[in-house]
From Swiss-Prot:
CDD domains: TPP_PDC_IPDC, TPP_PYR_PDC_IPDC_like. The lineage of its organism: Bacteria, Bacillati, Actinomycetota, Actinomycetes, Mycobacteriales. It is an enzyme of class 4 (lyase). This is Alpha-keto-acid decarboxylase. Its cofactor is a metal cation; thiamine diphosphate. Residues 347-367 are annotated as: Disordered. Belongs to the TPP enzyme family. Residues 394-476 are annotated as: Thiamine pyrophosphate binding.
Amino acid sequence: MPVTDAATEPAYTVGDYLLDRLAELGVSEIFGVPGDYNLEFLDHIVAHPRLRWVGNANELNAGYAADGYGRLRGMSALVTTFGVGELSAANAVAGSYAEQVPVVHIVGGPSKDAQGTRRALHHSLGDGDFEHFFRVSREITCAQANLMPATARREIDRVLSEVREQKRPGYILLSTDVARFPTEPPEAALPRYTGGTSPRALAMFTEAAAALIGEHRITVLADLLVHRLQAIKELEALLAADVVPHATLMWGKSLLDESSPNFLGIYAGSASAPAVRTAIEEAPVLVTAGVVFTDMVSGFFSQRIDPARTIDVGQYQSSVAGEVFAPLEMGEALQALTAILTRRGVSSPPVASPPAEPLPPPPPREQPLTQKMVWDRVCTALTPGNVVLADQGTSFYGMADHRLPQGVTFIGQPLWGSIGYTLPAALGAAVAHPDRRTVLLIGDGAAQLTVQELGTFAREGLSPVIVVVNNDGYTVERAIHGETAPYNDIVGWKWTEVPNALGVTEHLAFRVQTYGELDDALTAAARHQDRMVLVEVVLPRLEIPRLLVELVRPTSPDGSPRR
């Protein structure tokens, strides 16, 4: 632990206690931006034997990076300064709340003595009220604490426990004097939530589920909450208990092995491929596991799921044909369903698959690029272990339709949908797992919002593949409204020159307009695993993927408005 001059600072402080707890929870890097109210605390991060500081270009990017890190590690931390810094990060923190990502937001604040004077301190609103931003945090975090010396340890443990259990951000206001206040190290590990399943609820759920299933084949639709709640093993056991056709929503893409013969594809309501839609909506018994239907992943709520034939497995409760059983945790409900399939002694026949079509030959090398061409070729370039981040535009919807190789992790942000998120999030993902190559897919307009972190990739010695889709502006917005409107235009950048300008010396950069040029660039990226590779892909303004075409239609197939 950091030790300083005993005359000026105690050997072990409240700040050290917080850092030790974060390290205990699996955090080894902390993102953020320095400010005068957090500088002394940052000294303790730098001196900590199990933690490393990763500074960012701005607080918004730091929040996005912490989000990307937290999705892979299960916990992350972000440090900003009071007022100006924390509000800059608020968009990212709100996104983590919406998408259930555990991020601890630590805000360095003025000393309690300075706050007590109620004077107009810098970074405040000048009215003597230093809790404005604490109150803001209540809307976008699951737990908050304004640390006081006497209760700091207990409050730190409370916030961290809530973040770990709820899988949402927490907020800790750490005043400069409280951060240096003396305390003792943790005596024991942070207590874990021991579970809240009612044996009676579990027994009744099992009985009802067994009656509904009978000898039917079940079909499973899974989504991201299975990942967030760390119930993937229980879900995989259910899929292995019989021949179980299964699909995911776009939000849960890569949750399951998409190379499995039983994997149906992506379900998106009326925007689904017809075979996927039929398999899900006409299943004799459908198990929905961790499913949250949002507008952009459900074809604007066009799903047609019959509750009478559905077993819905949620975070703390499950239902069978509309009858709710609670409290019942997801993992235990999935285990009960697995036991039902195992005990009944009925094996379902193999899933009928359409005959495999021979792969079409690659397009002519001189052919101008299309969206489909780009995502087809990107998918063939992926290898097990890759972490793919697709920004909320043509990149996300272009990739959603494609099956990923086994062992590839896919990250998007379809609920919060903050464009530019994925570039700093890719940094966080790469820091979380530097042994897994990160592949970033992002539009030109989105990249302009957060591109500063290219320099941080270089400083951290990371070697992502970055595909920038240059379609001359906000193509998704053009597809929705304002095809030729000036507000959907952006200033064109010379993308192949951007890495140099941001301090990336060891890199490759390509500008591609034909299939042959794209093929050559991705082949070079595969050869050069030790450096950043940026590929600028030039596409027509109004070239959009099939799935996005379906989603932006003004009406559903039944004629009802989508928005």
